[in-house]
């Protein structure tokens, strides 16, 4: 029997959260994504204790309203149907980066993708120093057929899938030209130019500088700059 977990059946949404004054609003909105996993198990506690109890909405609300100063390095975990889950690790040191991850079954994500992306947009409006990604290039085989990697934050960045590209155009979230799609396979460039590890840079000044920079930059300008620096072969263009 094949025991390998079927990652291709899931979409992972991952968020890096900076704990500012809007953190609670971000968390409340983030947890609204968990309705899609239909949680049945719940845990909130120390990193080394992974015992799950029955899901209790009152307990969840209690956690949301607690004093977070007491809970550095704690985990909030919700487990749902079809191996779906929500995890939040509160940062080891307050005012630094916490990590949240939602794993949603691909069929459920596909059915509710616009609502899910709208919710992610709401999250980013509350916390412009927060960003995250749905790494569909890793988690499902249909990456080039429809899904892309999406980062949520002060600026929306994406390895554009076809429906995602149309969604961003329709919502006017970002000014995108069709030639942005040529960029889809240039992972090294995108990571080096646009993705900055939250673990390396934690200061408020960094987040402020990064946010201001991303508000000014335009995706099409980056694509044009990249095209000037790199000559694509005819084979690359056809592929």
Residue ranges of predicted features:
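Internal, hydrophobic cores of structured domains that mediate oligomerization or house catalytic pockets
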Residues: 28, 35-144
């Amino acid at each position: 029997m094949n025991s390998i977990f079927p990652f291709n059946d899931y979409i992972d949404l991952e968020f890096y959260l900076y704990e500012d004054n809007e953190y609670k609003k971000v968390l409340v909105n983030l947890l609204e994504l968990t309705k899609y996993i239909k949680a049945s198990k719940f845990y909130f506690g120390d990193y080394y204790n992974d015992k799950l109890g029955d899901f209790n909405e009152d307990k969840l609300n209690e956690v949301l309203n607690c004093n977070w100063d007491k809970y550095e390095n704690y985990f909030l975990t919700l487990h749902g149907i079809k191996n779906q889950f929500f995890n939040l690790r509160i940062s080891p040191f307050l005012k630094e980066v916490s990590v949240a991850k939602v794993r949603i079954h691909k069929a459920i994500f596909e059915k509710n993708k616009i609502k899910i992306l709208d919710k992610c947009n709401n999250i980013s409006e509350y916390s412009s120093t927060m960003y995250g990604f749905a790494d569909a290039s890793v988690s499902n085989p249909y990456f080039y057929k429809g899904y892309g990697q999406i980062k949520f934050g002060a600026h929306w960045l994406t390895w554009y899938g076809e429906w995602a590209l149309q969604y961003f155009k329709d919502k006017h979230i970002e000014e995108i030209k069709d030639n942005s799609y040529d960029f889809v396979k240039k992972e090294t460039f995108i990571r080096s130019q646009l993705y900055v590890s939250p673990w390396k840079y934690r200061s408020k000044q960094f987040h402020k500088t990064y946010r201001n920079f991303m508000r000014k930059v335009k995706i099409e300008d980056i694509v044009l700059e990249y095209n000037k620096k790199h000559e694509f072969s005819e084979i690359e263009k056809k592929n």
